[in-house]
From Swiss-Prot:
It comes from the Bacteria. Induction: Induced by amino acid starvation, glucose starvation, the DNA cross-linker mitomycin C (SOS response) and when translation is blocked. Induction is decreased in the absence of the Lon protease suggesting, by homology to other toxin-antitoxin systems, that Lon may degrade the YafN antitoxin. Transcription is negatively regulated by the cognate locus, probably by this protein. A member of the dinB-yafNOP operon; it has 2 promoters, 1 upstream of dinB and 1 specific for yafN-yfaO. Keywords: DNA damage, DNA repair, DNA-binding, Repressor, SOS response, Toxin-antitoxin system, Transcription, Transcription regulation. PANTHER family: ANTITOXIN YAFN, ANTITOXIN YAFN-RELATED. Probably forms a complex with the mRNA interferase YafO which inhibits the mRNA interferase activity. Antitoxin component of a type II toxin-antitoxin (TA) system. Functions as an mRNA interferase antitoxin; overexpression prevents YafO-mediated cessation of cell growth and inhibition of cell proliferation. The keyword DNA repair applies. This is Antitoxin YafN. One of its GO terms (biological process) is DNA damage response.
């Protein structure tokens, strides 16, 4: 069973006749074969949703997604070593944390 997460719904055939009619201030489920294929939102509803998501993201710590392969880590290490070897004493003296 598929959940429909909107109070209003429209099938794709009806949506094609007049799409602008369904961009209202609440979500509209778009159905295909009586199953939700997607949802329509007005610009203001979408902006409000994005604002809520941004607020939530600010409250949560960021999860790292940097998971390089062993070969990629070796390449990063090799390049870092090369950069360090190429640095001059002046480069090291200019470093500030």
């Amino acid at each position: 069973m598929h959940r429909i997460l909107a109070e209003k719904s429209v099938n794709i055939t009806e949506l094609r006749k007049n799409p602008a009619k369904y961009f209202i201030d609440q979500p509209v489920a778009v159905l295909s074969n009586n199953r939700p294929a997607g949802y329509l939102l007005s610009a203001s509803a979408f902006e409000a949703l994005m604002d809520m998501l941004a607020e939530q993201e600010e409250k949560k710590p960021i999860k790292a997604r940097f998971r390089p392969s062993a070969a990629r880590l070796e390449e990063i290490t090799r390049r870092a070593e090369q950069y360090l070897n190429d640095m001059t004493d002046d480069d090291f003296n200019d470093f500030k944390e």
